[in-house]
C-alpha cells in the first residue's frame, strides 16, 4: 500500500466556511505563511482594526508627528496570537532587518519597514497586521476535515488590490463558489 505524503497549504488562502463559530475566524480570509508537520501560521487579511499606521508610529516614537499619509494605512487584526506583535506581509522588492522570503512575497517583523512605509520608500504593496493565526501540529488538518475551511490559491490582487470587505467573497469566487449558497452540513465518503 502506498502512503501519500501530506499536503500542506503554505502560500494559499483559507476561507472560513459560513458556519465558522469561532469569533476569531468567522468570515475571515487567512493567508497561510507556513504549514508543515509542526503546525501552521497565517495572517487574517480582511479584518481592519480601528488603528492606522499613524497610531502605531505615535506609540513607537511619541516625540515625532507621523506623516499625514500614515492615517490612511490600516492595521489589520492578523489573528488571536501575539496581538501586540506586528507583522507586515509585502512585495519582495525591498528587504528589511527581520524579513523572511516567501513565495514572491516577504514577511517582516522589524520596525524599519514601518518607518520606510511612512517615509514613502517602503514596499510597493504591503499589509500590516497585529497578531497572527497559529495551529498546532494536526490542528488545521482536523479543522479542514471538519469542513471549517476551504482553501484556494493565493492571489496577490485579492490582498493588495481590493478593499478588505471584498476579499473573502473574491477568494471564494476564484473557486466558483458563492459563500451565501453553502450549507453547514457536509458529508464524507
Swiss-Prot record:
Disulfide bridge map: none
GO cellular component: a single term: cytosol
Domain of life of the native organism: Bacteria
Gene3D superfamilies, sorted: VC0467-like
UniProt xrefs under PANTHER family: UNCHARACTERIZED PROTEIN YQGE, UPF0301 PROTEIN YQGE
Family: Belongs to the UPF0301 (AlgH) family.
Protein name as it appears in the record: UPF0301 protein PP_4995
Amino acid at each position: 500500500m502506498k502512503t501519500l505524503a501530506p499536503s500542506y497549504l503554505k502560500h494559499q488562502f483559507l476561507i472560513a466556511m459560513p458556519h465558522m463559530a469561532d469569533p476569531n475566524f468567522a468570515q475571515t480570509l487567512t493567508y497561510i505563511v507556513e504549514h508543515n508537520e509542526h503546525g501552521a501560521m497565517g495572517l487574517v487579511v480582511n479584518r481592519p482594526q480601528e488603528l492606522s499606521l499613524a497610531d502605531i508610529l505615535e506609540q513607537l516614537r511619541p516625540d515625532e508627528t507621523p506623516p499625514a499619509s500614515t492615517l490612511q494605512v490600516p492595521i489589520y487584526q492578523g489573528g488571536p496570537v501575539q496581538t501586540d506583535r506586528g507583522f507586515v506581509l509585502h512585495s519582495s522588492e525591498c528587504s528589511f532587518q527581520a524579513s523572511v522570503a516567501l513565495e514572491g512575497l516577504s514577511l517582516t517583523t522589524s520596525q524599519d519597514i514601518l518607518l520606510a512605509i511612512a517615509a514613502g520608500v517602503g514596499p510597493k504593496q504591503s499589509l500590516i497586521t497585529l497578531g497572527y493565526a497559529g495551529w498546532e501540529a494536526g490542528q488545521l488538518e482536523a479543522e479542514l476535515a471538519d469542513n471549517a475551511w476551504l482553501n484556494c490559491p493565493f492571489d496577490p490582487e485579492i490582498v493588495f488590490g481590493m478593499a478588505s470587505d471584498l476579499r473573502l467573497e473574491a477568494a471564494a469566487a476564484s473557486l466558483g463558489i458563492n459563500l451565501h449558497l453553502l450549507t453547514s452540513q457536509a458529508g464524507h465518503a
